[in-house]
């Protein structure tokens, strides 16, 4: 059981890294923060299509990561 959870954790980590790297950057760097990037921060922008899917998948994989870590640490006691 412990080995199975560790294998799931490794797969989850690889998937999480891949999904994060596939996402587009949301800011225009340091210059955007100084010269009016606040309107993007506080403006209502809806994510659509692939961006929305990648965002939700990142959240799901992150939650799965923490649940697996808690289960592995609980079984390790």
Curated annotation (Swiss-Prot):
Q: Does the keyword field hold Membrane?
A: yes
Q: Name one GO molecular function term.
A: protein-transporting ATPase activity
Tell me, in one coarse class, where this protein mainly resides.
membrane
Biological process, per Gene Ontology: intracellular protein transmembrane transport; protein secretion; protein transport by the Sec complex
Tell me where in or outside the cell this protein is found.
Cell membrane
Which ranges does the record mark as transmembrane? 2-22, 57-77
Q: Topology versus the membrane, per the UniProt entry?
A: Multi-pass membrane protein
- Keyword Transport listed? The answer is yes
**Keyword annotations:** Cell membrane, Membrane, Protein transport, Translocation, Transmembrane, Transmembrane helix, Transport
Q: List, alphabetically, the InterPro entries matched.
A: SecG
Listed GO CC annotations: plasma membrane
Q: Which family does it belong to?
A: Belongs to the SecG family.
Physiological role: Involved in protein export. Participates in an early event of protein translocation.
Its name, as the record gives it, is: Probable protein-export membrane protein SecG
Species, as recorded = Staphylococcus aureus (strain MRSA252)
The gene name reads secG
């Amino acid at each position: 059981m412990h080995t199975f959870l560790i294998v799931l954790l490794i797969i989850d980590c690889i998937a999480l890294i891949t999904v994060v790297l596939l996402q587009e950057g949301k800011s225009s760097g340091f210059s955007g923060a100084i010269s009016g990037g606040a309107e993007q921060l506080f403006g209502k922008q809806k994510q659509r299509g692939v961006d929305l899917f990648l965002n939700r998948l990142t959240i799901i994989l992150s939650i799965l990561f923490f649940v697996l870590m808690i289960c592995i640490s609980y079984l390790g006691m």
